[in-house]
Swiss-Prot record:
The lineage of its organism: Bacteria, Pseudomonadati, Pseudomonadota, Gammaproteobacteria, Enterobacterales. The modification Cysteine sulfenic acid (-SOH) is found at C286. The gene is betB. PROSITE patterns: ALDEHYDE_DEHYDR_CYS, ALDEHYDE_DEHYDR_GLU. GO terms for molecular function: betaine-aldehyde dehydrogenase (NAD+) activity; metal ion binding. It is an enzyme of class 1 (oxidoreductase). Dimer of dimers. GO terms for biological process: glycine betaine biosynthetic process from choline. This is Betaine aldehyde dehydrogenase. It comes from the Bacteria.
């Protein structure tokens, strides 16, 4: 693909040049080619976007629920019509296999938008009787202008997960995509405008997180920030948001999730789940189950089943429909994952497979890392304690149910957890004791629109998706009505 034209900001229904004068490049991680130069939003651009959003939000919030619903449904239709086109762009920008982006990324994002478009008319207040002459009613009102700050692993899906409930509740959103993968968020802005969204209701500001992101979290005109990313960055976003104007926040942060295989489990099923929980999207999924606990007596058999499945991974041309494994999103991220792999070897974990970059004509110019499985791991190893965000599985053994529950919970993270067992009683008993916000029994990874997604502990604050997320983009106003004569004590 030839280099794209320089990408601008999207403010008030159209493209506009950044006033900062700064740019950055976005690359295709499969081959290292530059896709485009992208303009970076500065402080003045954030001010412009906030002013635009304030104007557009008043128009948007004044529309009826059905009017807003119809516009968002039109956007859903356009997304589905352009699924393949958007998936190709997402593959170029992220390196993910087209077989994945064409069936997951845009599809699941559109599903969430459709879900919230349908919920808009159901956003209701309540009526509370006090006595014969007085009652209270409540209204759910939009917050105003909110900001979304996205991660690089699911660019358009995250943009939709954040914008769908925000817009459905009557807010305007300023979205900052990751500087690593900024392209499809700009296309989403075009689609929203084409669907009839008033100018300013969805503005997109590409830029570096430490600058553009901080300007957004500092800005007094923004009522809430929804952030997806790492824990360290999330803490900074939360601190800035609170220090500037006590903004509300939603944080979807990192994870080091446990997958527990019990001794009665079907090991073929367990191996299939472990593969999806570690190597889907080349391991760049926040909910990945990278700590795989297996009974000591099942370890050898489980390892062989995993190795057999690793052999079936197909890396290569990301547009080949048979390819199911792509490069990592960038060269700096590849190097970071390789440092973790080296640390695992240094600390005594045994490499079952991988542990290196992929080599050959298809791989030499890209950010490729081989699917890697470590075994003989212990809880104190760096690869077991810290989020790697790459195709690296760690296998650990255990002896008892109580032991594995304790060890599974021995982490600062609490995003996801899963178990594989044939015993339904044990399934629920154990899941109820695991400290994680998203849990799976005999499956892994599905996050449909109806399910609240978020973590315990350092893995986040608040939830995305589900009814409660729509409500989190509103503020409740209570109004008392008195029909009797008011009595003053003065």
């Amino acid at each position: 693909m030839s280099r794209m034209a320089e990408q601008q900001l999207y403010i008030h229904g159209g493209y506009t040049s950044a006033t900062s004068g700064r740019t950055f490049e976005t690359i295709n991680p499969a081959n290292g080619n530059v896709l485009a130069t992208v303009q970076a939003a500065g402080r003045e651009d954030v001010d412009r976007a906030v002013k635009s959003a304030q104007q557009g939000q008043k128009i948007w919030a004044a529309m009826t629920a059905m009017e807003r619903s119809r516009i968002l449904r039109r956007a859903v239709d356009i997304l589905r019509e352009r699924n393949d086109e958007l998936a190709k762009l997402e593959t170029l920008d992220t390196g993910k296999a087209y077989s994945e982006t064409s069936t997951v990324d845009i599809v699941t994002g559109a599903d969430v938008l459709e879900y919230y478009a349908g919920l808009i008319p159901a956003l209701e207040g309540s009526q509370i009787p006090l006595r014969e002459t007085s009652f209270v009613y409540t209204r759910r009102e939009p917050l105003g202008v909110v900001a979304g700050i996205g991660a690089w692993n699911y660019p358009i899906q995250i943009a939709l997960w954040k914008s769908a409930p925000a817009l459905a509740a009557g807010n305007a959103m300023i979205f900052k995509p990751s500087e690593v993968t900024p392209l499809t968020a700009l296309k989403l802005a075009e689609i929203y405008s084409e669907a009839g969204l008033p100018d300013g209701v969805f503005n997109v500001l590409p830029g570096v997180g430490a600058e553009t992101g901080q300007y957004l979290t500092d800005h007094p005109g923004i009522a809430k920030v929804s952030f997806t990313g790492g824990v360290a960055s999330g803490k900074k976003v939360m601190a800035n948001s609170a220090a500037s104007s006590l903004k509300e926040v939603t944080m979807e942060l990192g994870g080091k999730s446990p997958l527990i295989v019990f001794d009665d489990a079907d090991l073929d099923l367990a191996a299939d789940i472990a593969m999806m929980a570690n190597f889907f999207s080349s391991g760049q999924v926040c909910t990945n189950g990278t700590r795989v606990f297996v009974p000591t007596k099942c370890k050898a058999a489980f390892e062989q089943k995993v190795l057999a499945r690793v052999e079936r991974i197909r890396a290569g041309d990301v547009f080949d429909p048979q390819t199911n494994f792509g490069p990592l999103v960038s060269f700096p991220h590849r190097d970071n994952v390789l440092r973790y792999i080296a640390k695992g070897k240094e600390e005594g974990a045994r490499v079952l497979c991988g542990g290196n970059v992929l080599k050959g004509d298809s791989f030499d110019n890209g950010a490729w890392v081989a699917p890697t499985v470590f075994t003989d791991c212990s809880d104190d190893m760096t690869i077991v304690r810290e989020e790697i965000f790459g195709p690296v599985m760690s296998i650990l053994t255990y002896e008892s149910e109580d032991e594995v529950i304790r060890r599974a919970n021995d982490t600062d993270y609490g995003l996801a957890a899963g178990i594989v067992t044939a015993d339904l009683n044990r399934a629920h008993r154990v899941i109820h004791q695991l400290e994680a916000g998203i849990c799976w029994i005999n499956t892994w990874g599905e996050s449909p629109a109806e399910i609240p997604v978020g973590g315990y502990k350092h893995s986040g604050i608040g939830r995305e998706n589900g009814v409660m997320t729509l409500q989190s983009y509103t503020q409740v106003k209570s109004i008392q009505v008195e029909m009797a004569k008011f009595q003053s004590i003065f």
